[in-house]
Amino acid sequence: MSAPQKTSALRTPFKTVALVGRYSTAGIEGPLEELASYILRNGQDVVFERETSLATGLTGYPALTAEEIGREADVAVVLGGDGTLLGIARQLAGHNVPLIGVNHGRLGFMTDIPLEDVQSVLPDMLGGRYEAETRLLLESSVVRDDSPIFSALALNDVVVNRSGISGMVELAVSVDGYFMYNQRSDGLIVSTATGSTAYALSAGGPILHPTLSGLVLVPIAPHSLSNRPIVLPQEAEVTIEVATARDASVNFDMQSLTSLLPGDRIVVRRSKKTIQLLHPVGYNYYATLRKKLHWHEYPTEDNRL
């Protein structure tokens, strides 16, 4: 399977735009309504994700479930942060509906368009002029007594960790059926390139460019300093067995979780489903890194020494 791709070309304009918002944010109704009106004036039809519509009271537009958006919309514009985009991305996985991330608050790695810039870049993007990136997803299942008890998708990461405040978890990690190591730690992160700038980064993992399709294993506060992050090929299957743990759980993009017992196995592999992120023409991933991570190598806005 080929690596995630980044492409830029003039394509067919979008006709129906779904709006998804971080509806728990106070005051988001105004920006959402303004964005919807602007898209209508630009010549596209607008629908709202149902929970966004109900929570904000913006009921003057068709309100669709994620499944219905997958069938009826051509593109989804997400107003919020990376967490909002993560949630809808998993729901739309497999529907071939690309996502445009508009940031409402701090700049995100995926919601990379500032709200104040949206009216200057959105017409071109909805008209078919944009840069597209395909991002891989992880699929994971929890196996107990040889029977799957839980499964979920993740765009960022699958995290096995201790839930309580005391004690470590002991994990036995295998890759493609080959035993790798036993690890005593606060947990283990299995991350995509997309997730390498999230929890994995704060745990000491490397940054992977989003067009890379490998996985990275990142221990969380390991007991042994020799347990280091390792990058694996895209087709690797990672199995994590809980050897001992007082109170452990597995999280998927830190948005859904299930509790674990000793003997449980968590199997993580690349999903056949992907998502597509759209950016304005001229999008610069390194500029996003510089702004988010405060890499102040250049003292001026025009990147000159």
UniProtKB/Swiss-Prot annotation:
> What family does this belong to?
Belongs to the NAD kinase family.
The family database entries (PANTHER family) matched by this protein are listed as:
NAD KINASE
Which positions are catalytic residues? Answer: 82 (proton acceptor)
* Catalytic activity, reaction form: NAD(+) + ATP = ADP + NADP(+) + H(+)
Name the needed cofactors.
a divalent metal cation
Keyword Phosphoprotein, does the record have it? no
Query: Which terms under GO biological process does the entry name?
Result: NAD metabolic process; NADP biosynthetic process
Cross-referenced NCBIfam families, in alphabetical order?
Answer: PRK01231.1 (NF002306), PRK02155.1 (NF002561)
Organism field:
Cupriavidus pinatubonensis (strain JMP 134 / LMG 1197)
Q: InterPro entries in the record, alphabetically?
A: ATP-NAD_kinase_N (IPR017438), ATP-NAD_kinase_PpnK-typ_C (IPR017437), NAD/diacylglycerol_kinase_sf (IPR016064), NADK (IPR002504)
Known function: Involved in the regulation of the intracellular balance of NAD and NADP, and is a key enzyme in the biosynthesis of NADP. Catalyzes specifically the phosphorylation on 2'-hydroxyl of the adenosine moiety of NAD to yield NADP.
This entry carries the following GO cellular component terms, namely: cytoplasm
Q: Does the keyword Iron apply?
A: no
Give me the gene this protein comes from. nadK
Alphabetical list of Pfam families matching this protein: NAD_kinase, NAD_kinase_C
EC number(s) on file: 2.7.1.23
Locations listed in the record: Cytoplasm
Q: Which Gene3D superfamilies match?
A: Probable inorganic polyphosphate/atp-NAD kinase, domain 1, Probable inorganic polyphosphate/atp-NAD kinase, domain 2
Residues recorded as binding NAD(+), renumbered to this chain, are: 82-83, 156-157, 184, 186, 197-202, 221, 255
Superkingdom as given in the UniProt entry: Bacteria
- Protein name, UniProt field: NAD kinase
Q: Which UniProt keywords apply?
A: ATP-binding, Cytoplasm, Kinase, NAD, NADP, Nucleotide-binding, Transferase
